């Protein structure tokens, strides 16, 4: 048998591969593609992988495999890679299971992916209301377990406190070189200082004025900036420098010199100071340090050298300039801060492209219209309606003592309710403007003044004037009440007419405006979509004259006399003779003037303040006497039931309560100026009505009057006269903080190209980008939340460059890997900033700058100790050294030590941020693991109940007060069934 088989074997030809027509149906390549066994490369990746590590890296390493001929085979490979995403192993075993079942957790994760970025009070279009309501309902119950889970993490951090002392050898060597080079920079300053003054950070007087930084002008932009790289083939990615990067990296001495480049020795800053004469010149790092003081703990320690110089000015007296240089190295530095210094350099190289553009081409700040969304009428109308409800009356939280303009003539801005307009805001013009988007206004009396949107402070000023004059003004005389029935009601009818705009002239009572014609005739249109007011004498149009001798109005036109039933202010008392109209009194020589006083007019309707929705044809709407007296302008009466002082006190009590108004619509805008010029002064400046819609909202987007002279506002610096940096860029900007001018030297870290606005998507510009490295110790549990200092850093960048977008690079401190790149838009940053007391931060900044302004010429040192509310001001010794002198060199003679603290620097997690294993396994962040599938019935019962019992409240307080993260584990992964056993 065997011999026969041997004889028959040569008949088989094994060299010919089997074929089916022209295509090979079985080959070695097909075998590899269809085989379920892993390839050699996959086996090598699996053998070198850490336990619990995301296998996205393995997918990138297998990209060099032969191309898959079938789409289904490619999907199988993706599923295999994703399927190997393991749940990380906890550092400390979980104490219990979650109250939510696996199905409930997966359902909530799906909803969290959809609606996590949507604000709670937003009116997003295209969302499923039922799902969104379900998400909000589940979120309430999830937050209860999140609180308990954060308490568990805090206790776990105490058990693993040694994790926070971890610092690799490379990181220790790198940070030591940087810190030693920074210590050498300290020797540039004086060695001995004597204590000059001790003051409080907040000052000894409370601040009640909301303030902010207002960008006056971008003076100079030098250097270039690189593009940011935000897309990587796999995550997490190892942060390490390549050979090319190591060759191009700066030395520690160069890095320290760039960090401590004094603005007092900057020739560019000296030239700009001599031209623009700011009181303060500081760096962006010193600005952040002065803002990063959060009470009541004030945990940050810092020392800032200050140089005060007096520079001569041609044709004027010398000017004192305060130079605030960059902060000195810290005396104490945590391991987390050292780790961040080490990881910041490779992250910078990894997220940078090779291409760069001049920094002068970057769209750093918002344009003069400040918001492109104002072109979108539907969104503007909604926002106006909200603003009008919140800003209907005075805001006594604001300091308006400097806003009184008694004896100063102002314009009269009239508004009329229109059923077609949902909500409007009057514009500061010479002629009355109807609250229509398409209103056309012609103002020949002052043609150089165009229509512009009024800011919130102007509206507050005008309303304050009305309240003050209602109480104090007694100059109107009783003669204006003689014809109360026909005059008062007639003017009130004109005001409350729902089909026609109020007809008034708002000319400026200046020396030129006092020579106006005796009669001005105004055209009114009863159309709901368009109203044109023309201030030319025209016999074809109805005219409105006011006789100042008898104060009687004669209205020509049938439409203005038909609104007897729509009168909203129908009170008839003898006290109505109190009419405050100084212009009428001054012009009582027989000349005729236009209707109304010199203050801005208001229609007698509760919906007529700062963009209120119009009344329409509501004829039966009643208005209280208080509202009618506050809102109507043509004739101001004090009613019998109206106690001016009492009502003002009531309004003050109501308005002193917390309101839901957003404080900083734009972080860099100055919401309230304590020394704001009068309305007449503001109208004297140029304004561009063509770039503004006719009805804008009264928010921080309005452009206030600048503090620079017009010749300096339009002056363009010649970059060839200035010294550009060899690497990077310098941007010099001029800001105003109340009555202070600040010259800030900053830089743009990275840029990206994106559409200029939501409406103009085809126009793409370069915008600034700021990347914040964040070293974390709890990646096995989730993503750590931003601390107060990190939020303040992002906020400071938004102050300097209002068009900035932000990225937070979450870095695992144990593996040195970037495991999440979080993008934060400007809108999301505004929501996060609610955790900061921005008004207090500005108050501290202003108090320190005011204190520095009172010092004499010389060199000083600002010193703040950790957890201290006081500020020490040292002055450089003039050769006289005492025992109490502060030796700066001795203090910074060695490397900074590690602060000793009894508590672990733990930071709570952010329950709204999802990691890949959360999405893949359907696990809610910051919650305990669910029970196994074997107890499905019990799980559903326990999950649907969703216990609402409250847990210990001190948990949230502790997590809120803590400011640093917790631990991580190198072996994070564990099989799902093992996770459930724990």
Swiss-Prot record:
Superkingdom assignment: Eukaryota
A GO-annotated cellular component: transcription elongation factor complex
Keyword presence, Nucleus: yes
GO biological process: positive regulation of transcription by RNA polymerase III; snRNA transcription by RNA polymerase II; snRNA transcription by RNA polymerase III
Subcellular location: Nucleus
Entry-annotated residues carrying Phosphoserine: 17, 326, 571
Positions with biased composition (Basic and acidic residues): 479-497
PANTHER family with a match to the protein in the record: LITTLE ELONGATION COMPLEX SUBUNIT 2 (PTHR14633:SF3)
Protein name from the UniProt record: Little elongation complex subunit 2
Gene (name only): ICE2
